[in-house]
C-alpha cells in the first residue's frame, strides 16, 4: 500500500499569491542533522502568464551561475513545470529577504549586463536541449519582473 503524502506546492492556493516573490517553503533536517532550505522563487503570477521555454531555459542556466556568484550553499534552482518560477534548494538556514536580494541582483544582471557569451551550457555537449535558448526572451522577462519588484513575502507585497 503506497503511503499517503502531501506535496506542499499542490496545497498552495495559487489564486492568492502575489508574484514576483520569494517564499520559504520549508527547512528540513536530514538524518545526520544537515539542514536544507527550499524556496518558491515565483517570477510570474500563476495562471495569468508563463515564461516561454527558451527564455525560461536561459534564465535557468544563468541563475545557476549568477546565484552561486552571489551566495554560497546553492544545491539546485530548477524551473517549475508551469513555467512561472523556480524551486531553489540550499544548504543551511537561509533568510528569504537575502534570497530575494540575490534573485533581484541576478535578474538585474540578466536584464542589463549579460551577453550571449555569458550564458553557460549552450552547446550540444553541455545541454540536453541546447537549441531551446533565448537570451532576448530572458532579458525581456527579467525587465518585466524587475519592474514589478521582487517581494520577500508571497501573500502581500514587500519588495526588496
Curated annotation (Swiss-Prot):
Identify the residues that bind Fe cation: 57, 61, 127
HAMAP family to which the protein is assigned, alphabetical: LuxS
Q: What's the protein called, per UniProt?
A: S-ribosylhomocysteine lyase
Q: State its cofactor.
A: Fe cation
| GO aspect biological process, one term | quorum sensing
Write out the GO MF terms: iron ion binding; S-ribosylhomocysteine lyase activity
Pfam families reported for this sequence: LuxS
Question: Per the record's keyword annotation, is Lyase included, yes or no?
Answer: yes
Organism domain of life: Bacteria
Amino acid at each position: 500500500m503506497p503511503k499517503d503524502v502531501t506535496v506542499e506546492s499542490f496545497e498552495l492556493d495559487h489564486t492568492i499569491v502575489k508574484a514576483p516573490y520569494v517564499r520559504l517553503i520549508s527547512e528540513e533536517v536530514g538524518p545526520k542533522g544537515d539542514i536544507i532550505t527550499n524556496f518558491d522563487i515565483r517570477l510570474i503570477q500563476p495562471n495569468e502568464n508563463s515564461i516561454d521555454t527558451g527564455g525560461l531555459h536561459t534564465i535557468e542556466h544563468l541563475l545557476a551561475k549568477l546565484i552561486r556568484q552571489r551566495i554560497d550553499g546553492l544545491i539546485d534552482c530548477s524551473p517549475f513545470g508551469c513555467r512561472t518560477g523556480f524551486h531553489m534548494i540550499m544548504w543551511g538556514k537561509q533568510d528569504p529577504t537575502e534570497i530575494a536580494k540575490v534573485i533581484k541582483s541576478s535578474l538585474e544582471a540578466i536584464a542589463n549586463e549579460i551577453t550571449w557569451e555569458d550564458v553557460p551550457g549552450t552547446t550540444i555537449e553541455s545541454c540536453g536541449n541546447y537549441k531551446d535558448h533565448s537570451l532576448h526572451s530572458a532579458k525581456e522577462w527579467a525587465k518585466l519582473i524587475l519592474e514589478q519588484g521582487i517581494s520577500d513575502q508571497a501573500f502581500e507585497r514587500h519588495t526588496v
